Amino acid sequence: MLLTTPSSRGSRAQSGIANVSWLALSLLLLFSPTLGSAKSAADYYVRSLPGAPEGPLLKMHAGHIEVDAQNNGNLFFWHYQNRHIANRQRTVIWLNGGPGCSSMDGALMEIGPYRLKDNHTLEYNNGSWDEFANLLFVDQPVGTGFSYVNTNSYIHELDEMSAQFITFLEKWFQLFPEYEGDDIYIAGESYAGQHIPYIAKAIQERNNKIQNDQSIRWNLRGIVIGNGWISPAQQYPSYLTFAYEEGLVTKGSSLAKDLEVYQSVCESKISASPNAINIRDCEEILQQILARTKDTNKQCYNMYDVRLRDTYPSCGMNWPTDLVDVKPYLQRPDVVQALNINPEKKSGWEECSGAVSSTFNAANSLPSVQLLPELLESGIPILLFSGDKDLICNHVGTEQLINNMKWNGGTGFETSPGVWAPRHDWTFEGEPAGIYQYARNLTYVLFYNASHMVPYDLPRQSRDMLDRFMKVDIANIGGKPADSRIDGEKLPQTSVGGHPNSTAAEQQAKEKIKETEWKAYAKSGEAALIVVIIGVTVWGFFIWRSRRRNRGYQGVYQRDIGSGSILERFHNKRSGPADVEAGDFDESELDNLHSPGLEQEHYAVGDDSDEESPNHQPAAPPSSTKPGGAQP
């Protein structure tokens, strides 16, 4: 619980519980430094973001939350409120891998609402995941990205990581209670394939300990892992298999024979230590593939996207190309200030921390693949997806771990003994997108022509996948859904077409409003013309009649009463109710064209209550350690 603040003590005094003197209050504040420093949501509010596109700023919060007071351990988060609500309120927590790689990769290069056009200009991400879900990016473990901890206090094991993450969530929900009832999905990629199942298990254990109504059980509704490092025992041997399938190495060649020797050594190490997460001898297979497939220009395969090449020995460490803009942007002083970065953190943002990676060896942790069966059997849906051009955490290893895993009374994607769930062809807007496979609460999606970072390559397709998994229903907000089909069948509308700054539904509504307005203006114009013609006719009649009268009564001054009454009636009609034809257009009809969900704020509590500045005008809602990368 949050510590008592002066304002809340005042409300207690009003209720007659206690009468505290000013002297006692001052002493309390003096000897309770944490009381004076307790933060509120307003302290995390992002009031501006350098380089953001024109228009209202998306609602966001960012900053540090302490998870280890003894060692000054703090986790950094960046939260975006969703742009629209479909049928339920959802929050997606996103984690990148490493270990020790910042989730700002996900925020600015994959699923976040913005991408960098250059190192000082942001543009909207066409396919961002914040369309129907709040996004919470967290730099973890401590020491990663903008997160920090005292030197020599980095953590080592997966259970330490998950315990600190639960502490983070407890404190985060205290700051932002309006989101605590959301459906929660934990998503990420690469080495986050180890983190996510451990966090999911810790959430379940935390929920099971709740005995009263003083705490809220968190609604964990699913986990999503892309190109995950989940089962090293399957992933290490898949390097050579993948290299054969993609034509990186020719089977039967002298190189292949040499690599098979390394493969044999690796398999013996796995047999001796089947639960090891990091095996040095197995990493040698990947290193040899990269080193011995260089071209004449010393260009090696990009281990994250084998369609590309990179200078040796980087072999993908310079990828993706957006990195050249992300790093200088996140190191800008004005950006650091805007994101409420603790000024005591002296070091600037780094994509991946070697210190975190080398310390987090998980030597005493079981690989997360062993947690998946229990999670599935407890009712937690799991989505595993892979880009087919990734080498380091390739789809061959993911498919092998699924085939070997037993859960809910079957092995792999068995639907009955010896019968396997079919692979369904997926097309997106008329183009082959990949395959879907499902059995007993587990979904697998293979993306065609995608790298280690699928949302980086295919943002809209990945959003479509997410919407389907979360069962987003856009029927109540209208709009034309994306043409996404499984085996040629267009399933329920779960994803909208892409638009840089809104949903296609909203754009369509705006176009419909504009069309209605023009029709109304045309009607009003026609009506006004008729009124003018009538008025001119009446006025002409009045002039003609007046002149006749003046000729008959030239000796008498008389104000023409008929003239006044006709003009008054004419002006009254102009200023009073519109004529029948113009009245057919009612501006309230325009309001009805807006679906209630499109322009509605997410939560009444969260709109401006967290911005306490009286001058604030809230915006309208409107080895390898790498990007999300794995260090096998």
UniProtKB/Swiss-Prot annotation:
Annotated source species: Aspergillus fumigatus (strain ATCC MYA-4609 / CBS 101355 / FGSC A1100 / Af293)
Record InterPro entries: AB_hydrolase_fold (IPR029058), Peptidase_S10 (IPR001563), Ser_caboxypep_ser_AS (IPR018202)
Region of interest (Disordered), ranges: 480-509, 574-632
GO biological process: apoptotic process; proteolysis
Pfam families per record: Peptidase_S10
Function noted in UniProt: Protease with a carboxypeptidase B-like function involved in the C-terminal processing of the lysine and arginine residues from protein precursors. Promotes cell fusion and is involved in the programmed cell death.
GO CC terms of this entry: membrane; trans-Golgi network
Similarity annotation: Belongs to the peptidase S10 family.
Enzyme Commission number(s): 3.4.16.6
Residue spans, topological domain Lumenal: 39-523
Record keywords: Apoptosis, Carboxypeptidase, Glycoprotein, Golgi apparatus, Hydrolase, Membrane, Protease, Signal, Transmembrane, Transmembrane helix
Compartments reported by the entry: Golgi apparatus, trans-Golgi network membrane
Membrane disposition: Single-pass type I membrane protein
Lineage: Eukaryota, Fungi, Dikarya, Ascomycota, Pezizomycotina
Bilayer-spanning residue ranges: 524-544
Signal sequence, start to end: 1-38
Molecular-function annotations in GO: serine-type carboxypeptidase activity
Residues at the catalytic site: 190, 390, 452
Biased composition (Polar residues): 492-506
Cytoplasmic membrane side: 545-632
Compositional bias of kind Acidic residues: 581-590
Glycosites: 19, 119, 126, 441, 449, 501
Name of the protein this chain belongs to: Pheromone-processing carboxypeptidase kex1
Catalytic activity annotation: Preferential release of a C-terminal arginine or lysine residue
